[in-house]
A protein has these predicted regions:
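A charged, well-structured terminal subsegment
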Residues: 264-270
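Ferredoxin-reductase
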Residues: 1-91
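Short, surface-exposed secondary-structure boundary micro-motifs
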Residues: 44-46, 98, 249
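FNR/FR-type flavoprotein reductase catalytic core
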Residues: 79-228, 233
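Local cysteine-cluster metal-coordination motifs and their immediate loop/turn environment
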Residues: 127, 209-210, 232-262
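Structural signal for conserved beta-strand scaffold positions within catalytic alpha/beta enzyme cores
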Residues: 12, 59, 173-175, 228, ...
């Protein structure tokens, strides 16, 4: 699947609990993304910041005119994300994608059995949106573990509740301040579920590095395979800048934008 550099028309920007936002754009030439793939985007004013920002394709829908409507779930952190959150309908923004390698276990027919656990930390839920939809279409049951510092960090929680419940699964929430779900870290109910024989055959995760490292440890202890959609600073999105290296257990490196962003849990040196 070849990436295409084009201009996307902003359809709307939905304000979520600060500092989160959901941007929808119509892209004429882009092919549908696979779960876990991403795009490089920037605001309508390209004068500053110069570099684009990497965003997971959170949702997508083919339009009747042959274009693709993509949804990007974001968090305002700096000037780049601030510019995207400030976009207005009708503005045209640069979009390069789809990029990277998605979740392997979704494409592998041999892995489409058994229950799955999806584990997200905060805005990491954006990297699991298409995956949750793919699992639902495959009629594969999954539980969605969603953790954050506070209730405001569990954006789109109801979307993941609906998707998981349609498969016979459930949404599990934790927050560090106890404002939503149980107080604590989301890795605690995941570990308890594995010990209690929840029957997970695959674990998928996206979020802060510490969360994914903990999920990798828990999955290994439970003898369960898994994959992580990693996040690193990224300058170009296609391997030219070499700025998004991920350290592997074999002592080598892989580029998050090319070989990733999805890696097996057991191949990354967390």
């Amino acid at each position: 699947m070849a990436a295409v550099d084009s201009r996307g028309e902003v359809l709307d920007v939905q304000a979520l609990p600060l500092p989160y936002f959901l941007l929808r754009a119509r892209v004429a030439a882009m092919e549908p993304a696979q779960p876990g793939q991403f795009v490089m985007v920037a605001g309508a004013d390209r004068s500053e910041p110069y570099l684009r920002r990497a965003f997971s394709v959170y949702d997508q829908e083919p339009a009747s005119d042959g274009s693709l409507v993509i949804s990007l779930l974001g968090k305002v952190i700096g000037r780049g994300t601030e510019a995207l959150a400030a976009c207005v309908p009708g503005e045209r923004i640069p979009v390069l994608g789809p990029l990277g390698t998605g979740f392997h276990s979704v494409a592998d027919d041999a892995s489409k059995s058994g229950r799955a656990a999806l584990v997200a930390g905060g805005i990491g839920s954006a990297g699991l949106g298409l995956l949750a939809q793919a699992l639902e279409r495959a009629r594969r049951s999954f539980d969605f573990f969603y953790g954050g510092r506070s209730a405001e960090d569990l954006v789109e929680a109801e979307t993941f509740r609906r998707l998981s419940e349609r498969t016979g699964g459930r949404l599990v929430r934790t927050t560090e301040d106890g404002s939503a779900g149980e107080r604590g870290l989301i890795t605690t109910p995941l570990e308890e579920g594995l010990r209690a024989g929840a029957g997970y055959t695959t674990v998928f995760t996206c979020g802060p590095h510490g969360l994914m490292a903990a999920v990798a440890r828990i999955a290994a202890a439970g003898g369960v395979a898994g994959e992580a959609a990693t996040e690193t600073p990224m300058g170009c999105g296609y391997g030219a800048c070499l700025g998004c290296a991920v350290t592997l257990k074999n002592g080598g490196y892989a580029l998050c934008c090319r070989q990733g962003p999805v890696f097996r849990l057991d191949e990354v040196a967390w």
